[in-house]
Design a protein with these regions (language model features):
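Proteins enriched for Cys/Gly/acidic motifs involved in redox and nucleic-acid/cofactor modification
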Residues: 1-210, 247, 262, 284-295, ...
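Extended hydrophobic-aromatic, low-complexity segments
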Residues: 260-261, 274-275, 298-301, 316-318, ...
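Generic beta-structure capping elements
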Residues: 15, 89, 135, 160, ...
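Short, solvent-exposed loop/turn segments at secondary-structure boundaries
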Residues: 59-61, 176-181, 211-216, 276-279, ...
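Short flexible coil/turn linkers enriched for glycine and charged/polar residues
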Residues: 148-151, 161-163, 258, 268, ...
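Terminal RNA-binding accessory module
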Residues: 348-443
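Conserved, mostly hydrophobic/aromatic
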Residues: 185, 202, 236, 264, ...
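Conserved SAM/AdoMet-binding glycine-rich loop
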Residues: 81-85, 93, 194-315
Length: 443
């Protein structure tokens, strides 16, 4: 069955990082601005946008699996197959190969999705449409104004990466580091607050590399956002250790709205492995950096990323990662098995590690990280903190929110979504906390 000639409903499914979540929201806003209606799910939509991730092979193959499932479900339901658009980093990396392999209607890269309405119109006329150009963040000027959001919102301020870690495809799929203009960011932040946001997370592949011609730096941008009335919380992610400047460290002590949470990936705990990854920092420099951050904000929660099984990583070198985890005491982390990506230097390195060894190492690493997370959560028992209410819970009268340290907190309250509530933590599980409302903060 052919795709609808003029799709009237759409569904955007995003894979991967928070940047993709932001991009997916913006694509949905684009289609809504064209008069289209958001469908409840992919199987009931005329247009399905798969906003993809290319970091690991499994994520890439999931896209092709989803395409097949969508078409199969359409045949079962005796309805026209949806128009399928593949967006994001898989689209950028594979381009015409996706059209050849999966016969999709639209392929659009992460720097060109502002052209999605025109590409959909082209596909509706009967020809596949592809756009993987990489203009320097021209898309932001073409996107509609932000009019709806939840209490927590993402805001992209920087894109691309110049670090060229040997395992990573981001420099090839997102391009070089580019910072959005200061005024455009502040204007979008104000629009988000006007639309209901109480918390904004600044996004970038290397968000702490953000800067402008005036040398404002991310700390200066955060200081400007701190002055926006109605904005209660500021966060930022993801950072690179080499771009963690003194001004940004001081901001964690000086800016009250900047939450005590820092996601700072390290990837490995051994210097030889870090050098092979082209991380441009050492184990010791990373640990000393964390000491500087903790010196100005002792209660800060630390998060990170880890890769196990990087080519030629020995058992002793992996053990260095475990000792680094013990030394830091993370509040939460992401950890993955190394996945060779075509075109990256690491994919051609000798000493590729077997899947069995990677599985075993990942289990040990995650056990250590889970212990740290449980210990961090347990340490909050009896503490009072402000919780931002984000959604309803499963029980009548139960609401869910986030602590300043990015922990999920559930509590019984009559507070509304978007309220700030002072809570005493009375129960700590491995993945969430329970609290009792003590004072309702400013609405």
């Amino acid at each position: 069955m052919n795709a609808p000639k003029n799709p009237s409903t759409f569904h955007v499914k995003s894979f991967g990082c928070q940047m993709n979540v932001y991009d997916g929201e913006r694509m949905a806003e684009l289609m809504a601005a064209q008069g289209m209606t958001a469908a409840a799910d992919a199987d009931s939509a005329d247009l399905v946008v798969l906003n993809t991730c290319h970091i690991r092979e499994k994520a890439t193959e999931k896209v092709y699996s989803d395409i097949g499932r969508l078409r199969k479900n359409a045949r079962r339901g005796d309805r026209a197959a949806p128009m399928i658009a593949v967006a994001g980093c898989v689209a950028q990396a594979e381009g015409e190969e996706i059209v050849r392999r999966a016969k999709v209607d639209v392929v659009v890269g992460p720097q060109a999705y502002h052209n999605l309405p025109e590409l959909v119109a082209q596909a509706a006329r009967g020809s596949s449409a592809l756009d993987t150009d990489m203009p320097a963040i021209a898309k932001f000027g073409a996107l509609p104004a932000r009019r709806r959001t939840g209490p927590s919102a993402f805001l992209t301020v920087q894109e691309g990466c110049d670090k060229f870690c040997t395992y990573c495809v981001v420099p090839y799929t997102r391009g070089a580091e580019v910072s959005r203009p200061f005024d455009a960011i502040v204007d979008e932040a104000r629009a988000l607050v006007d639309a209901g946001a109480r918390e904004i997370t600044l996004l970038g592949q290397n968000v702490n590399a953000w800067d402008d011609d005036a040398g404002t730096g991310l700390h200066g941008l955060i200081a400007a956002l701190d002055r926006i009335e109605g904005l209660a919380r500021i966060r930022y992610t993801t950072s690179h250790p080499n771009d963690m400047r003194e001004g940004l460290i001081r901001a964690h002590a000086e800016v009250e709205k900047l939450m005590p949470f820092l996601h700072l990936p390290v990837q490995a705990g051994n210097d030889r492995v870090l050098k092979a990854m082209n991380r441009s920092h050492t184990r010791d420099s990373y640990l000393k950096l964390l000491d500087r951050v903790r010196a100005v904000r002792p209660d800060i929660a630390l998060s990170g990323d880890f890769i196990v099984g990087f080519p030629s990583e020995s058992e002793a070198e992996f053990a260095d990662t475990l000792t680094l985890v013990d030394a830091v005491g993370y509040s939460q982390c992401f950890s993955f098995k190394y996945s060779p990506r075509p075109g990256t230097p690491a994919a051609e390195m000798d000493g590729q590690i077997s899947p069995e060894v990677m599985d075993e190492r990942l289990q040990r690493l995650q056990a250590a990280l889970n212990r740290d997370q449980a210990a961090f959560n347990a340490a909050t028992l009896g503490r009072r903190c402000t919780v931002l209410i984000e959604r309803q819970g499963k029980l009548p009268g139960q609401m869910l929110g986030k602590s300043p340290w990015l922990q999920s907190v559930h509590l019984m309250t009559d507070a509304r979504i978007g309220d700030l509530v002072e809570v005493e933590i009375v129960q700590a599980g491995p993945n969430s906390l329970a609290g009792i409302e003590r004072v309702k903060a400013a609405a």
